[in-house]
Each structure stands twice: as C-alpha cells, then as structure tokens.
C-alpha cells in the first residue's frame, strides 16, 4: 500500500431497500458510478435479518414494499438506535406521510427519480452522517 492510497478515504456507504429489482439494480449502478459503496436489500425483513448492519452513511428506502412500509422500516431502525439519515422514495406522497416524514427528519424523493434529485439528497445526507 502506497502512502497516497493510505490517505484515500473509504467511499460513503449507501444502503438501498426496494422490492423492485429493476429499481434496486438501477440505483445501485448509478450510485456506484457516483463513487458510493452500495449494499442492497429486497425488503425490510431482509435488511433487519441481516445481522450486524455495519457502517452506513445513508439509507434509501422505498415506501411501498410488501410486509413493511418504508416508514415502518425506518421506525424499526430508530428503535434499534440507528440514527443514520434516511431518504424515502415514493410514487405519490400525501400530506399525512409528508408531515410524518418531515417530523422524523426523513427526506422524501418522489418517483420517477428525475435528474439528480436523489443523488443530491444522498450527498446532503452523507455530509450530515
């Protein structure tokens, strides 16, 4: 290992939880191109049953998943004293969900994911992690 490589910081880690494999794979590919390390899970249960979750700078979680919603998953993470920033991706946010997310300091990015809205939110979250 060279002295220069010792100074290189590890990339920020983003965890994606989405039941749609096309969305999950697309997000992972895009974020890896942006320089993030990515771990992805098919649903809330898969993430919660993964054992030690390891370090993470940001969670990107789909709201509508079978078994447990994104907000419920974030609630489970908070109950485990995991305060890592979370971004909720959702097709049709309503006022009640938006208010709950704002109160819990959870960012919402609306689907379809256009331009760099999600990447910008992830950058912001990683700066505050």
Where is each model-derived feature located?
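Acidic, metal-coordinating helix/loop segments flanking the phosphotransfer/catalytic sites
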Residues: 40-58
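Active-site residues of response regulator receiver
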Residues: 62
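Short amphipathic alpha-helix used as the core "switch/output" element in two-component signaling
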Residues: 71-82
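Non-catalytic signal-transmission and effector/linker regions of two-component phosphorelay proteins
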Residues: 1-15, 21-22, 114-129
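Acidic catalytic/metal-coordinating carboxylates
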Residues: 42-43, 69-72
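Two-component/phosphorelay signaling modules centered on CheY-like receiver
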Residues: 21-39
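Receiver (REC) domain active-site loop signature in two-component systems and cognate sites
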Residues: 65
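Hydrophobic/aromatic residues positioned on beta-strands within the core alpha/beta folds
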Residues: 89-91
